[in-house]
Swiss-Prot record:
Recorded GO CC terms: cytoplasm
Recorded name of the encoding gene: fabA
Catalytic function, reaction form: a (3R)-hydroxyacyl-[ACP] = a (2E)-enoyl-[ACP] + H2O; (3R)-hydroxydecanoyl-[ACP] = (2E)-decenoyl-[ACP] + H2O; (2E)-decenoyl-[ACP] = (3Z)-decenoyl-[ACP]
Protein name: 3-hydroxydecanoyl-[acyl-carrier-protein] dehydratase
Quaternary structure, from the entry: Homodimer.
Entry's Gene Ontology molecular function annotations: (3R)-hydroxyacyl-[acyl-carrier-protein] dehydratase activity; trans-2-decenoyl-acyl-carrier-protein isomerase activity
PANTHER family for the chain: 3-HYDROXYACYL-[ACYL-CARRIER-PROTEIN] DEHYDRATASE, 3-HYDROXYDECANOYL-[ACYL-CARRIER-PROTEIN] DEHYDRATASE
A GO BP annotation: unsaturated fatty acid biosynthetic process
Cell location: Cytoplasm
Family: Belongs to the thioester dehydratase family. FabA subfamily.
Keyword annotations: Cytoplasm, Fatty acid biosynthesis, Fatty acid metabolism, Isomerase, Lipid biosynthesis, Lipid metabolism, Lyase
Lineage: Bacteria, Pseudomonadati, Pseudomonadota, Gammaproteobacteria, Enterobacterales
Organism: Klebsiella pneumoniae subsp. pneumoniae (strain ATCC 700721 / MGH 78578)
Pfam families listed in its UniProt record: FabA
Summary of the function given for this chain in its UniProt record: Necessary for the introduction of cis unsaturation into fatty acids. Catalyzes the dehydration of (3R)-3-hydroxydecanoyl-ACP to E-(2)-decenoyl-ACP and then its isomerization to Z-(3)-decenoyl-ACP. Can catalyze the dehydratase reaction for beta-hydroxyacyl-ACPs with saturated chain lengths up to 16:0, being most active on intermediate chain length.
Length: 172
């Protein structure tokens, strides 16, 4: 039985990375340093732009985060690909929250636009995921649009984020 709360703490997310939140067959979030959120503040099966599900999560920003030390020296900025990966992480987390089983894999994205950046002076990144469709057949797949905000300002959008849950990834 999946623990279907509307919000999750950092410890809950770490438990997901250890395979403890959604059970042995459920999808896992990555462990630190690749876990790109500190908490999930809202998860619903309705709502969002398409009324088919919504997730909102946050990452606290501080200058000591690992990526600021190497991307780029003298010009620290959070890599845009980490924000994109966070959105994929949340799509997979939602599929597990719905009871889906399997190993999560990003399958693609239709379009990504960057209109801003995350600097070490920022306080918080917010991720918003708006589900468009859930396929629950042999392959469980989520299709969603996403937004990344820094200190409440929209800086990335992604259309048609796709994540699938696979029983066997050996041929993937």
């Amino acid at each position: 039985m999946v623990d279907k709360r509307e919000s999750y703490t950092k410890e809950d997310l770490l438990a997901s990375g250890r395979g403890e939140l959604f059970g042995a067959k459920g999808p896992q979030l990555p462990a630190p340093n690749m876990l790109m959120m500190d908490r999930v503040i809202k998860m619903t099966e309705t709502g969002g732009n398409y009324d088919k599900g919504y997730v909102e999560a946050e990452l606290d920003i501080n200058p000591d985060l690992w990526f600021f030390g190497c991307h780029f020296i003298g010009d620290p900025v959070m890599p845009g690909c980490l924000g994109l990966d966070a959105m994929w992480q949340l799509v997979g987390f939602y599929l597990g929250w719905l009871g889906g089983e399997g190993k999560g894999r990003a399958l693609g994205v239709g379009e990504v636009k960057f209109t801003g950046q995350v600097l070490p002076t920022a306080k918080k990144v917010t991720y918003r995921i708006h589900f468009k469709r859930i396929v629950n057949r042999r392959l469980i797949m989520g299709l969603a649009d996403g937004e990344v905000l820094v200190d409440d300002r929209l800086i990335y959008t992604a259309n048609d984020l796709k994540v699938g849950l696979f029983q066997d990834t050996s041929a993937f």
